[in-house]
Amino acid sequence: MTGVRGMPPGRAGRVWLGRRLAVAARAAELLDQKVRVLRQEAERFTLLSERSEAEWTRAAQEAQLWSVRAALVGGQAALRAATDAHPAGLSLGWKTTMGVSHPAEVGWDHGPDPSHVEAMTYGPATVSAVAAHRVALEAAVRHAADLAALRAVTRELAVTRRRLRAVTDRWVPRLEDALAQVRLGLEETERAEGVGLRR
């Protein structure tokens, strides 16, 4: 027996296996194409996450510096009062690449910008600290979105590679072996029928 479930006997089996091989070849082609696209996307998200991490690190250091300045000039109470005034809002836009959903856009609602009225109330160092923390928060969320996209694409890339190997290393060879056995069996049957007709 050939080990391929559902295969009809005889010439119909040869046709059936030929169709299955064509499907397997097309599946391997599509999976290979998906691997190439996902690999490019993974490289792109790797670069984006590295850049966003550097931006986040720089922005966090800047925010820390302004926090220290604001605390020294206006005290912790002024810093807390300024941050409670306008909470930030966040929205994520999603995109699908080759069947993989991942964060694509980060939208912000910071509330009103620090103005001269707040500068008079809290002091310019506090207003600068609040603005620096907004930038750092935005950079952190952008980095988190880039990392989430990278993880989603990398996970799908690994699954797709596994599927491609299953098709090319197991499914196609099994079908080719079965087709070779069917052809050999049909040739033997035709020879036996030819010998029987000659007698």
Please describe what each predicted stretch is.
Residues M1-R199:
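Charge-rich amphipathic alpha-helical interaction elements
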